[in-house]
Regions:
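Conserved hydrophobic beta-strands of the Rossmann-like cofactor-binding core
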Residues: 5-8, 82-86
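The beta1-alpha1 cofactor-binding region of Rossmann-like NAD(H)/NADP(H)-dependent oxidoreductases
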Residues: 38, 59-71, 102
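Conserved glycine-rich cofactor-binding loop
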Residues: 12-14
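Conserved glycine-rich Rossmann-like NAD(P)H-binding loop of the short-chain dehydrogenase/reductase
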Residues: 28-42
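Conserved NAD(P)H cofactor-binding loop of Rossmann-fold oxidoreductase domains
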Residues: 88-93
Length: 127
């Protein structure tokens, strides 16, 4: 099975951008999530649209459930359904024992664990 409607979290840079490039092509629709990399997301969008890919960009802080819900709603409005979810986004800060806080730990857990689970649950509803 080949995916045609794809969501990639953390898709604007590094591995996410490489995945978007690999999965792009005519008759493909890709929703690229970004948080702080707006200019890179816009540049990638232009690049992918040259080869016939329809690209949607969505900004969201994946540590915030309200942003995750808005992203899912946006994805459904644009893609109608999706047949591939790439949970690529992650939060990686250089926390050490001397600057570690429960707030930063919570943000890591929400971004790196809870959100992929919530998005996977939404994906399961679409297949």
């Amino acid at each position: 099975m080949e995916a045609n409607k794809i969501i990639i979290t953390g898709g604007a840079t590094r591995i996410g951008a490489a995945i978007a490039k690999k999965l792009s092509g005519p008759n493909k629709e890709i929703l690229i999530h970004y948080n702080k990399s707006k200019s890179k997301a816009e540049s990638l969008k232009k690049e992918l649209e040259i080869n016939g890919t329809k690209v949607y960009l969505v900004k969201a802080d994946l540590s915030k459930e309200t942003d995750v819900n808005k992203m899912v709603k946006f994805a459904k409005s644009k893609l109608k359904y999706f047949d591939c979810l790439v949970n690529n986004a992650s939060l990686f800060e250089n926390d050490k024992l001397d600057n570690f806080t429960t707030d930063s730990w919570g943000k890591h857990l929400r971004t790196n664990l809870r959100t992929p689970a919530l998005l996977s649950k939404e994906f399961a509803k679409n297949i």
